[in-house]
Amino acid sequence: MMTVYLPVNEALLTDYLKYLFPTEKGSSCLKVSGACSFGKLLIANITTSGHPVSVPEGDNVIKLHIPKQDCTQDLADKFLYFTKGSVCRLNAALKAVFDMDFHDYYQRGIDKGYQKKDIIDAFIISRKLCSVDPGDALHKRTYRHEQKKRLSRARYLARKANYIQESLDISGLNTIPQ
């Protein structure tokens, strides 16, 4: 196994990364899998060096084990790291994967008739997002998303009403036949 470190922007996303790639037995390293799309993205963004690289510092630095496969065999016996640009892109992609997963889970729960709070709690537990308190953040995210949908719908209805009003302009028909 080859090792690389990834600084993650948020503790919530650190927990989500642990959900995507479970730790190996007896180790704190996450085992990256190429079966997951984000795993493929991680592997594709690895940079190699012929000399040792410094380990990133911070609270949310994750140690990843990269499996030896056909596509990673040229990484063996080299020092692996992520560039600052790739760390930024990977964090943005991880957030997008999280958002899509949450939105999909939430929508399926709503479609089945479950309450919003129950869906969010089930998502937190199923994804093992318990080392931080993501409840408020997810409730706020859901609220903002619903607010955007309501505003979009209100704008659509206002445009539709305006169109109908203009098409039915009756200003020239003020006389009533007797």
Residue ranges and their predicted role:
Residues 1-86:
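Long, low-complexity interaction regions most often at the N-terminus
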Residues 91-112:
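Positively charged, polyanion-binding regions of nucleic-acid-associated proteins
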Residues 107-127:
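Short, charged amphipathic recognition helices of the HTH superfamily
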Residues 124-137, 162-163:
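Short, basic interhelical loop/turn and adjoining N-cap
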Residues 131-150:
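Major-groove recognition helix of helix-turn-helix-like DNA-binding domains
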Residues 149-166:
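Short Lys/Arg-enriched helix C-cap and helix-to-coil transition segments
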Residues 169-178:
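Intrinsically disordered, low-complexity, charge-dense segments enriched in Lys/Arg
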